[in-house]
Amino acid sequence: MDAPRNAAPGEFAAVMDFIDQVFRPGQTGTRIMHGQYPHLYRPDAEHMGRSLVLYDAGTLVGHLAVHPVGLRLGGVTVWAGGVGGVAAHPDRRGEGIMTALLAASETHMRALGFPLSILGGDRQRYGWCGWENGGRRTTFALTPRSLGRATAADLALPLRRLRWDAATRRRIWALERQRPYGAERSLDDLRYRFERTSREAWECRDAGRFAYVVLGGPAHQAHPYERLDEFGGDPALVLAMVRQLMAQHEVTSLRAVVGPHGPDLALLRPVASSWHVEADGMVRILDLATLVAQLAPVLRRRHRRLRESGSIEFGMADSGQRAILRLGPGSVRRVRLSDRDMVTLFFGLHPAGEVFAGRPAARLDGMLPLPLFVPPLDHV
């Protein structure tokens, strides 16, 4: 078996066929994943270089991609290696292919300078090599009863599929950037997140107001609508658009996923039949010192609430990493945790005072954790 290596542009068709075989065996068509994730998979050298491929006797048997994801974390941006498309040939599972690819991806991400890695996957599958549940998202259930049935005024609104002129692109980009926690998007790539086979984006312009919504269906298909993956613009117009689309498409329930953004939560809580809060994905700390240095402005600002001085020395027991956050004169407090518990301290779902009660890390409650969130349109 060959060692994992970066894919070349000429391998685009082979890579797309392979990951379709692994991830979309029941769906018809060609280059299915390319259509569902056009912002990730493209035949140019830059995007193909993100894929690690593993061959055995000339046959592609494994794939893993590392995509750069800029995480907005309350005023700073930390770039993470977003791991996706982890695939072993169905007939070759249990041969160590995934293990080899994950090890190669770690080397690759460290070489690129990513202090973090993120992925979506099973905790038992990925936890053994350092990833842990992290981040925070709220999923709201919207029904015609909770949201209110579409009125004549709602049904009269001029909805249309989102158009991609330069002004609309800049407007949507600016609206999303108002959220303090999320993922960085470039203007050049923005369109690829919205125009994909797995979702449909709608806009409405009415009496000087503007709003957009993005909906999707099951199994990475656009229909039937079951998810509200993103929205922005005039709040009342957003809800009216959702009511119209639910009525026209006979939708009885929508799941709406949002991050830790007050206006989004305030908009959906009153019109939801229920909601639940859960970890947003899995996180691994690759470089603790770089992470602490990049987060320092936010951590110092949040630390002022604790009314304490001195410095904090973070230590990761498994990997032996250390980092110091200097907060002023005074003693050094040492917080030593396992690698996965350090993820929980920095990005976990629950307050540090609850998870680490009776331990030094509990004193950082209020400064940590940070509510990391990757919007659905930015998943890898």
Where are these regions (language model features)?
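Short amphipathic alpha-helix that is part of the acyltransferase structural core
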Residues: 1-68, 75-78, 82, 147-188, ...
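Active-site/acyl-donor-binding loops of N-acyltransferases
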Residues: 132-149, 232-236, 240-380
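Conserved acetyl-CoA-binding loop-helix of GNAT-fold acetyltransferases
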Residues: 85-88, 94-107, 233-247
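GNAT/GCN5-related N-acetyltransferase fold signature
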Residues: 54, 66, 88, 204, ...
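A glycine-centered beta-loop-beta connector
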Residues: 55-59, 205-210, 359
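Conserved GNAT acetyl-CoA-binding A-motif
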Residues: 102, 107-121, 249-260
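Conserved active-site tyrosine of GNAT-family acetyltransferases
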Residues: 126-127, 131
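Amide-forming acyltransferase catalytic core, primarily the GNAT-like/NAT-type
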Residues: 136-238, 243-244, 256, 289-308
